[in-house]
Structures are given as C-alpha cells and as structure tokens.
C-alpha cells in the first residue's frame, strides 16, 4: 500500500508524504488500497480503447459511465469495501475485452490495422483476491519511481487525482441526466495518457490545465443538472436545531438521493435533515418545498463520529466523506451510490424503504430546541441578481474587498486559520464561501454591508462554478480581468474534488490562490516552484498577515 492523495496523508519529519502499512490515516486498509490501484490500472487500459474508438467515430456510453463511477469509488473516504472492488475489477475486465473487440472491428471497417496495445490495455487481473493483491505492485502510483524520479511521479499523481475529482462531479451530473461528449473525451484522454507512463513534465502540465478546463465544463454541467432539476438556489434560512419527531440524516453531496428520500418520507411524519455538504440543498426551491426537510444537523465530515452517534435516527451516506462507523450507530447507517463499508447496508437501487423503516423504529428527537438558523442559497443567479447593488457598493467604497474562503474541511491542525481569517476580515469586506469549510465560521454574525449580508454561502464545493461565473461577471462590469478585481481566493483543500477545482483555477488564469492548510504531499519542491512561479500559488501563513497582504495597495503592472 502507498497512498498520498489527500491532505491528511502521513508526513515524516523529513517532509516525505504517504500512507503505507496496514492502514492509512483515512481508515483504508492495505488490501482495499491495493485493489483500488488495480482498478485504476484497468481504467487506464479501458481509456486506451475508448480514445481509439472515439477516433474512429464510435462511442460507448457504458464505458463512459463505468469510468466515472469506478474512479469516484477511489476518492478519499468514499468506498472501503474490498468485495465491491473485486466485483468492479471483474466488470472492468469484461468491459475491456468488449472494447478491445469493438476497436478491432471498427478499425477493420475503417481499413486500418488496429494497434496492438500492451501495458494496462493488456492487463489480465487474477481470479482470486490473493492473486489481485500480488498484482498491485505494477499498478501502484509509485510504479517506476526509481527510473523516472519523484517529479514525474508527482505530476502523474496531480493528473490522476485531478481526474478523480472530475469523475466524481461528472457522475453527480450524469445521475441527473446531464452528460456531454467533451467530458467523456477529456476523461478518457487523461487515462490514455497515464497508460503510456508519460515522463515529459511540460506535456503533463499542459494536460493538467486541459483537464482543469474539462472540469469547468463538468461543473457547468452539474450546475445545469442541479438547477434544471431543482431550480436555481435562492437565499434560504436553514434551521440548525432539531424539532421533535422521527428523523433521517442525509450526508454527502448527491441531491438526487436526498430527493428520493424526501419522496419516500412524504406524509410519514418523518423529518429529514441534511449534514455536511448537503446543507446547500435547502436553497434549491424544489427541495425546500418539502415541509419535512426540517433543517441541517451537525457540521463538517470530520465530526461525524460524534454527531452520528448522537443522532436518533438512521443516517445515509450518499458520497464522500465516510469515516469508520462506530458501534453506537453502525447498525443504523446506510451507504448509497459509490459509497461502501464492509458490513453496512447498501442502497444500490434507489429504494430507500429500509431507511424509512429504520426511522420508524428509532426514537427520533424527543423535543424541539430553540430555533437557530444559518443562510445558504447565494448561487450565481441570486448574487448576479443583486449585481447592480454590489457594483454600486464597491464604487461607493462600502465594499473594499471580497474574500472567497472555501473548500474542504478536515481534522488536521492549522484549519483554525480559516475561522480566524473570516472573523478577522474587516467590516468593509465580503466573505464568499462554499464547500464544507464554511462550517468553520458560518454561525458567526457577520452583519450586512451595502444592504447585503457580509457572508454569502454559495453552495457545495462544485459550486466553485458559480463563484467563477460571479467573478467573471464582476470583471466584465468593471472592465478588468478577474485577477484585477478586489478579490482574494483562500482555499482549504482535502481531497481530489478540490484538486480538480484547483486545476480549473489554474486553467482559467486565476492567480495568487492561497492554499492550505498544507500543500499537497504529492507535489515535489520542483513542482511547487512551478506553481509558485507560473501561477502565483502561495501557502497560507497567518490570517492577520494574509489579510494585510491581500488588502495592501498593489504596485502598478
């Protein structure tokens, strides 16, 4: 086992990063980690055939969908169930064989001789768990490191981990019916590239930026899927204290699963609560219309073991981030979609009736607590609807600066920086936020500025798309570039969705992003130098110093 894909990966005193041994920091055991590597190796081979079929005018929707789902299962804190990975490895082998035959047929019909592909495209997985684990060394993210060096391994990892984030967002869009050929083509292109074990750093950097542009398309598609299905988010106060009654808790990111649970509990007297990244769901009109969507319970993912133990009903994990379930709630937590943990009940078919039955059998909340709320739903349409008011406040000097403080939360030391940054931001500045990092400060009383709330919750991590559209619209209004706006991006990262968003920011030319609490362990000093020198990426320091730097007058170019 070797894994260094997330922010919490083990780090030695010398600075070397990576989890090994029997279990990673996230709780992923060695066997599961190795099986994930084997699956990704197979996906590279599938990508080789998909790209060649695309070049011959053939498309394969099953392959496109499987790639997204399978990559999603390998994200941090998504699926820990080795049996599911053994099944997916077998499925991948059958799919690869079918694609190989389809490619040979298509090439023959086009009067071409098909390439004899080796490596990942020719990989034959063992037919036993022991055999699969013995094959993991050829699939490791560090395979060939002694020959190619750490910089190449790190750049390949940046591509792979960004690709995982892209796939996760694309899967969320796909389940709501939003698919685009450009997305499937971009994903397969990177898999095909990685299958060839690239060593050219400049080529891989260009491909990483191209992947960032693909991710912008993916986030646009997911935005279209979410708003097309559930309406454009509107500013909505969300109760954060419970009400008396039976209850279900829904965590993760998947709005379709939340909608299905709301439908399944309609007229049952069961209340539904969101958790973590599901908080922004309350801003979507068609979801908010369910009167039994009672509020948001708890905070960010890393606090779930305490929060889930105290919740008096069943819990559904619809996507990342799952932590090892504790005995106090293990028998009442369900997984759905790409999520998995050995021994937990899995909802594979969208039928949440077992969850409803569990809610009826559990006590629920026995009393209604005094109401407290937070506000979400400041999506691009809501903010741009007030654009004249915002622009007027900037021109009048009421708003001096915008801080986008967003991204993933986590348990590692140093994340209090984001709380301090938001709370220390001067009263003439606006705080925009997205992702579960908002829980660090979203109950703080920020007040108003120019008739607008000083803290605007834009949504989930994928709603970075809304933030970018807002920034581009403001740049157009002020007749300047995004980098010339009074706007600073202060990003907290944790896993691979954040890596995809980061690549999008770089691809769109957004400079001077502050990134923390630590920099990715897979990026070597040489790769970090590239990001610093070419894109102005900088690590966070202290809230006080970084605020002062952001607000300091900038020298004329």
Swiss-Prot record:
Alphabetically ordered keywords of this record: 4Fe-4S, Cytoplasm, Iron, Iron-sulfur, Metal-binding, Oxidoreductase
Entries under SUPFAM superfamilies matching the protein: Prismane protein-like
Binding site for hybrid [4Fe-2O-2S] cluster: 253, 277, 321, 408, 436, 461, 495, 497
Pfam family, one: Prismane
Record's keyword annotation contains Cell membrane: no
Superkingdom assignment: Bacteria
The protein's Enzyme Commission number: 1.7.99.1
GO cellular component: cytoplasm
Cofactors demanded by this protein: [4Fe-4S] cluster; hybrid [4Fe-2O-2S] cluster
Catalytic activity: A + NH4(+) + H2O = hydroxylamine + AH2 + H(+)
UniProt cofactor note: Binds 1 [4Fe-4S] cluster.
Family: Belongs to the HCP family.
Chain's role: Catalyzes the reduction of hydroxylamine to form NH(3) and H(2)O.
Official protein name in the record: Hydroxylamine reductase
Organism lineage string: Bacteria, Pseudomonadati, Pseudomonadota, Alphaproteobacteria, Acetobacterales
């Amino acid at each position: 086992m070797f894994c260094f894909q997330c922010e919490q990966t083990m780090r030695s005193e010398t600075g070397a990063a990576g989890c090994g041994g029997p279990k990673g920091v996230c709780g992923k055991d060695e066997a599961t980690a190795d099986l994930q590597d084997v699956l990704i190796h197979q996906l590279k081979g599938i990508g080789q055939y998909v790209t060649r079929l695309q070049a011959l005018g053939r498309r394969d929707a099953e392959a496109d969908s499987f790639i997204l789902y399978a990559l999603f299962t390998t994200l941090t804190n998504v699926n820990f169930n080795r049996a599911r990975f053994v099944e997916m490895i077998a499925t991948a082998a059958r799919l690869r064989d079918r694609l190989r035959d389809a490619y040979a047929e298509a090439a023959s019909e086009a009067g071409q001789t098909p390439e004899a592909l080796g490596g990942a495209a020719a990989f034959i997985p063992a037919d036993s768990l022991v055999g699969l684990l013995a094959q993991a060394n050829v699939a490791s993210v560090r395979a060939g490191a002694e020959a190619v060096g750490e910089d190449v391994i790190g750049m390949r990892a940046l591509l792979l981990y960004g690709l995982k984030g892209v796939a996760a967002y694309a899967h969320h869009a796909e389940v709501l019916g939003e698919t685009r050929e450009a997305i499937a083509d971009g994903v397969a292109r990177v898999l095909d590239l990685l299958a060839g074990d690239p060593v050219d750093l400049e080529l891989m950097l260009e491909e990483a930026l191209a992947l960032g542009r693909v991710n912008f398309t993916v986030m646009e598609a997911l935005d279209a899927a979410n708003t097309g299905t559930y309406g454009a988010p509107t500013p909505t106060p969300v109760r954060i204290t419970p009400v008396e009654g039976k209850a279900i808790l829904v965590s993760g990111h998947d709005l379709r699963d939340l909608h299905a649970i709301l439908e399944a509990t309609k007229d049952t007297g069961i209340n539904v609560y969101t958790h973590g990244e599901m908080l922004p769901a309350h801003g979507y009109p068609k979801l908010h219309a369910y009167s039994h969507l009672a509020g948001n319970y708890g905070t960010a993912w890393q606090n779930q073991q305490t929060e889930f133990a105290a919740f008096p009903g069943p819990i559904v994990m619809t996507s990342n981030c799952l932590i090892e379930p504790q005995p106090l709630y293990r028998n009442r937590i369900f997984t759905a979609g790409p999520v998995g943990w050995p021994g937990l009940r899995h909802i594979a078919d969208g039928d949440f009736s077992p969850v409803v039955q569990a809610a009826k059998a559990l006590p629920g909340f026995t009393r209604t607590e005094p109401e407290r709320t937070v506000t979400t739903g400041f999506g691009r349409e809501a903010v741009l609807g007030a654009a004249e008011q915002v622009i007027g406040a900037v021109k009048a000097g009421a708003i001096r600066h915008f801080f986008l403080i967003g991204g993933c939360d986590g348990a590692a030391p140093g994340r209090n920086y984001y709380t301090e940054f938001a709370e220390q931001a001067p009263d003439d500045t606006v705080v925009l936020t997205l992702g579960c990092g908002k829980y660090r400060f979203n109950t703080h009383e920020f007040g108003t500025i120019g008739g607008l709330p000083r803290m605007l919750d834009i949504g989930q991590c994928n709603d970075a798309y809304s933030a970018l559209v807002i920034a581009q619209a403001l740049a157009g209004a002020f007749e300047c570039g995004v980098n010339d706006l009074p706007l600073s991006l202060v990003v907290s990262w944790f896993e691979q969705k954040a890596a995809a968003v980061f690549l999008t920011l770089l691809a769109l030319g957004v400079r001077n992003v502050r990134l923390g609490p630590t920099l990715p362990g897979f990026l070597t000093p040489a790769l970090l130098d590239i990001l610093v020198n070419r894109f102005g990426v900088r690590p966070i320091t202290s809230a006080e110093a970084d605020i002062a730097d952001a607000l300091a007058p900038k020298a004329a170019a």
